[in-house]
Amino acid sequence: IHVDNTLYCSIRDGHQIVKISLDSSDSTWSNVAGMGCAGSTEDMLDQPFGIYVNDNYNLYVADTGNDRIQLFHHEESKGITVAGRALGARFALDKPTNIMLDADNNLFIVDSGNQRIVRVGANGFRCLIGCSKSWCSKLDEVCQPLTAAFDSYGNIFITNQYMNGIQ
């Protein structure tokens, strides 16, 4: 739910992002991103999962099936890839499932297929957690991470599908 009381939803198998105002009596959902069928062009999505809407109504989408993060500027139907294979091997993602943006506009990505959490910002692309590429062998590794969230102190909490828990 955005600060203006608009609910944004990712329709994974519908390959789109929709929104509805919770203050309106109109119960019509509006399409925000995606065309309703899977695709990889700038106006299409493939199994979108996590979403984030910033204060300027720009929408960030974890486009899981396309292994990328798409940015849709407010009222724009075509997205811009801000992380993913299209930007080169250094920025490659594998099934990203969640995204968060901090006050400094750093983008934090749950890169589920690569078992890691990465940050993309002014200082570039950096792996933060799960960087050793080992799979579930140590306490500081993540196993099939799905979502993540920060608390008010800046600590990160990660849901872990493999171990059915939170790290």
Task: Describe the predicted segments one by one.
Residues 1-4, 53-56, 101-104, 150-153:
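Residue-level detector of Asp-centered blade-edge/turn motifs that repeat once per structural unit
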Residues 6-9, 58-61, 106-108, 155-158:
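Conserved beta-propeller blade signature
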Residues 12, 22, 56, 64, ...:
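Short loop/turn segments immediately following the C-termini of beta-strands
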Residues 15-18, 67-70, 115-117, 164-167:
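Structural signal for beta-propeller blades
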Residues 24-49, 76-97, 122-146:
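Gly/Pro-rich loop segments of beta-rich domains
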Residues 90-122:
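Loop/turn-rich, solvent-exposed surfaces of beta-rich toroidal or solenoidal domains
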Residues 143-167:
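Blade-level signature of beta-propeller repeat domains, shared across WD40, Kelch, NHL, RCC1
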